[in-house]
Amino acid sequence: MAETDPKTMQDITLVVETLLQQMQDKFQIMSDQIIGRIDDMSSRIDDLEKNIADLMTQAGVEELDAENKIPTAQKS
């Protein structure tokens, strides 16, 4: 087996380290983007829940909902 030149080993090491750093940077960027999108979705869901609750209040559904919470066994 031929010995590898120390200069060549240093070059390979540098290339691998650079590649790993680039990959880590890209994964960090993607992770930040995903977390940002999840936060946006969470805010949108909160807004939707609030709007639905407001619409239900306007329609008087909350009053009907309280009546429907009686277990079916007790309704008869």
UniProtKB/Swiss-Prot annotation:
Homohexamer. Associates with heptad repeats of HSF1 trimers and probably also HSF1 monomers, and with HSP70. Association with HSF1 trimers and HSP70 coincides with attenuation of heat shock response and the conversion of HSF1 trimer to monomer. Keywords: Nucleus. This is Heat shock factor-binding protein 1. One of its GO terms (biological process) is cellular heat acclimation. InterPro entries: HS1-bd. PANTHER family: HEAT SHOCK FACTOR BINDING PROTEIN 1, HEAT SHOCK FACTOR-BINDING PROTEIN 1. Belongs to the HSBP1 family. It comes from the Eukaryota. One of its GO terms (molecular function) is identical protein binding. Gene3D superfamilies: 1.20.5.430. It is found in: Nucleus. Negative regulator of the heat shock response. Negatively affects HSF1 DNA-binding activity. May have a role in the suppression of the activation of the stress response during the aging process. GO terms for cellular component: axon cytoplasm; cytosol; nucleus.
